């Protein structure tokens, strides 16, 4: 691993103000001087910087690539650089390591966890599998490496329906960990032998149906972009089914799907039900459209732990490096590859 010269005056000046609290690293502004230094340090380290769609705007703007976790992991695997700096939560950096086992993968703050990934443990999945011998395990990519290793096929929010539909209809399916995405898959496929784990993303689960209905009534001409992890996804379909909102303007989309739809929408206003960091990319994609959050408090504290200070520290110190046990990585890689073989993985979340 590259070790940078800590005698650099500007590096010393910027890092001198870094603070470390349980909420993350602080003390550094994401200004133009910081951005220029991040780019310089990344070049010196031979690193490419990847940022998830839910990251702070300053982090997204300085990154070499912005996207969802699976798309970024593919970029990591194909990038010529030997070091990957993944600005996202921990399971995302693990996935990048799984697909790029010979590269150095860094995450600016290893404390950046995920409530959804943490909602099922390997032991819980093993016990669930024991209750349903012979069942096929389908896991959302928003899971830890250890859970992926116990999984038959991974899926994304874009291809979850296709993955489940590809499985023998007579075999039971265990879908984890997101209950709202699982409910969406069950609704679309009509599959009765699909068992859904009761996990959730605390941010998406907090975007509720009442808020969505209120916003839809207040903005009757808007389109709705709703992430399938949201607790309000069923409410969105109910509004359309009852005629309270035109069905053609209700779209259940992954983050990648939202970006694609932003480029083609004819709506002047779009209500967005997902983590608020997504608004930055949507507004860049279609600046003439008024994108508004259904819930402007839907901010992931873990995503926001990747601060300007954390990224600076990461590039100066080469920390925090992500390690995945080779055996777990090999098993997890197989479940991801099976998903890709089925096709249409689209957006990771």
From Swiss-Prot:
Single GO term (MF): metal ion binding
Root EC class: transferase
Keywords tagged on the record: 4Fe-4S, Cytoplasm, Iron, Iron-sulfur, Metal-binding, Pyridine nucleotide biosynthesis, Transferase
GO biological process, one term: 'de novo' NAD biosynthetic process from L-aspartate
UniProt entry tagged with the keyword Cell membrane: no
Reactions catalysed: iminosuccinate + dihydroxyacetone phosphate = quinolinate + phosphate + 2 H2O + H(+)
GO cellular component: a single term: peptidoglycan-based cell wall
Entry note: cofactor: Binds 1 [4Fe-4S] cluster per subunit.
EC number(s) reported in the record: 2.5.1.72
Keyword Metal-binding: yes
Residues binding [4Fe-4S] cluster, per UniProt: 114, 201, 300
Pathway where it operates: Cofactor biosynthesis; NAD(+) biosynthesis; quinolinate from iminoaspartate: step 1/1
Highest taxon listed in the record's lineage: Bacteria
Cell compartments where the protein resides: Cytoplasm
Listed Pfam families: NadA (PF02445)
Cofactor(s) the record lists: [4Fe-4S] cluster
UniProt: iminosuccinate binding residues: 52, 69, 140-142, 157, 227-229, 255
Major place of residence: cytoplasm
Further remark: Was identified as a high-confidence drug target.
Chain's role: Catalyzes the condensation of iminoaspartate with dihydroxyacetone phosphate to form quinolinate.
Protein family (similarity comment): Belongs to the quinolinate synthase family. Type 2 subfamily.
Descriptive protein name: Quinolinate synthase
Organism of provenance: Mycobacterium tuberculosis (strain ATCC 25618 / H37Rv)
């Amino acid at each position: 691993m590259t070790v940078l010269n800590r005698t650099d005056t500007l590096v010393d000046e910027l890092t001198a103000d870094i603070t470390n609290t349980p909420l993350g690293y602080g003390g550094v502004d994401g200004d133009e001087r910081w951005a220029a230094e991040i780019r310089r340090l990344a070049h010196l380290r031979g690193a490419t910087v990847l940022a998830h769609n839910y990251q702070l705007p300053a982090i997204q703007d300085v990154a070499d690539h912005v996207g969802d976790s699976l798309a970024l992991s593919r970029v990591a695997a194909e990038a010529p650089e030997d070091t990957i700096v993944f600005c996202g939560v921990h399971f995302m950096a693990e996935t990048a390591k799984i697909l790029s086992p010979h590269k150095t993968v860094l995450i600016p703050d290893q404390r950046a966890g995920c409530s959804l990934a943490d909602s099922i443990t390997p032991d819980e999945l093993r016990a669930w599998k024991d209750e349903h011998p012979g069942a096929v395990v389908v896991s959302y990519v928003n899971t830890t490496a250890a859970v992926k290793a116990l999984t038959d096929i991974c899926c994304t929010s874009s291809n979850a329906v296709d993955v489940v539909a590809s499985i023998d209809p007579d075999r039971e399916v265990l879908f984890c960990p997101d209950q709202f995405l699982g409910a969406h898959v069950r609704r679309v496929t009509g599959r009765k032998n699909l068992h859904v784990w009761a996990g959730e993303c605390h941010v998406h689960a907090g975007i509720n149906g009442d808020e969505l209905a209120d916003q839809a009534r207040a903005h009757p001409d808007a389109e709705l972009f709703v992430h399938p992890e949201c607790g309000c996804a069923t409410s969105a379909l109910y509004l359309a089914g009852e005629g309270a909102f035109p069905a053609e303007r209700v779209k259940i989309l992954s983050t990648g799907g939202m970006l694609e739809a932003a480029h083609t929408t004819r709506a002047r206003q779009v209500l967005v039900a997902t983590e608020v960091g997504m608004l930055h990319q949507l507004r860049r994609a279609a600046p003439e459209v008024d994108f508004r959050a259904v819930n402007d408090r839907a901010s992931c504290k873990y995503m926001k732990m990747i601060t300007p200070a954390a990224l600076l520290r990461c590039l100066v110190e080469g920390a925090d490096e992500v390690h995945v046990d080779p055996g777990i990585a090999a098993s997890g890689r197989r479940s991801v590859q099976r998903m890709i073989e089925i096709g249409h993985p689209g957006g990771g979340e």
